[in-house]
């Protein structure tokens, strides 16, 4: 007959293991407290970001009321983006099948500067003067053209002048990344997301280790009728 002590939490734990259980659950309580605080901080930062976005939405409504007022649109300079997307964009613009440029005497001549470059469900314009505002995309992205660029540095209008920038549009809550739009996430949010994931994985790992320990104790107890003299996989 198996005797179950009233002060034991598990039947297969040897005497004195209650202290280990108490320590384990104290650790779990501490971990859960930290996880709760981190998750609350993460959601607070997300709410603040969304609140800021809604504030921008109010100015957007005002911009629509005044029919594309300049204050409605936001100019942003593009920062480095996806290498793959940038490479695909360049290949499309300078590809023979696009019909956008005509190569002549070492120069790429723009065929029709009034026509935007249509690539990936987005329109790109040869400079701010060619840009056509869109109320649904209030962020105006400006990608400056480096004169030393081996490709865009050799692009010219038909009047021998060179475009200074490529302009495209993004939604209100986006940033300009290369020739694409990217989400407006912050380093702070990314770090906390990573910490939350690491903490969750750590807690799950501890639970798995404890389950293995309990299974080993149970197996040993059922086979020998008493607990182990030592605890395997002790944390």
UniProtKB/Swiss-Prot annotation:
Keyword field contains Signal: no
Organism encoding this protein: Caenorhabditis elegans
Record field: transmembrane: 27-47, 187-207
InterPro entries with a match to the protein in the record: CX (IPR002619)
GO terms under cellular component: membrane
Superkingdom: Eukaryota
Membrane keyword on record: yes
Localization terms from the record: Membrane
Principal location listed in the UniProt entry: membrane
UniProt membrane topology term: Multi-pass membrane protein
Keyword set, alphabetical order: Membrane, Transmembrane, Transmembrane helix
Domain CX per the UniProt entry, residue ranges: 124-185
Name used for this protein in its record: Uncharacterized protein C07A9.12
């Amino acid at each position: 007959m198996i005797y179950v002590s009233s002060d034991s939490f598990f039947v297969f734990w040897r005497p004195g293991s209650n202290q280990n259980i108490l320590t384990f659950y104290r650790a779990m309580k501490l971990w859960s407290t930290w996880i709760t605080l981190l998750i609350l901080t993460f959601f607070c930062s997300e709410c603040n970001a969304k609140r800021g976005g809604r504030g921008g939405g109010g100015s957007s409504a005002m911009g629509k009321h005044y029919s594309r007022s300049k204050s409605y649109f936001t100019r942003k300079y593009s920062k480095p983006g996806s290498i793959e997307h940038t490479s695909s964009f360049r290949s499309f613009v300078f590809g023979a099948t696009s019909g956008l440029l005509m190569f002549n005497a070492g120069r790429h001549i723009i065929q029709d500067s009034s026509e935007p470059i249509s690539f990936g469900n987005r329109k790109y314009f040869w400079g701010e003067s060619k840009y056509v505002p869109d109320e649904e995309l209030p962020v105006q992205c400006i990608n400056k053209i480096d004169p030393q660029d081996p490709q865009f540095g050799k692009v010219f209008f038909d009047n021998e002048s060179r475009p200074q920038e490529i302009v495209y549009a993004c939604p209100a809550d986006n940033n300009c990344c290369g020739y694409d739009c990217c989400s407006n996430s912050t380093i702070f949010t990314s770090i906390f997301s990573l910490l939350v994931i690491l903490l969750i994985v750590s807690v799950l790992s501890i639970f798995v280790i404890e389950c293995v320990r309990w299974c080993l104790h149970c197996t040993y107890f059922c086979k020998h009728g008493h607990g182990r003299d030592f605890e395997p996989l002790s944390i």
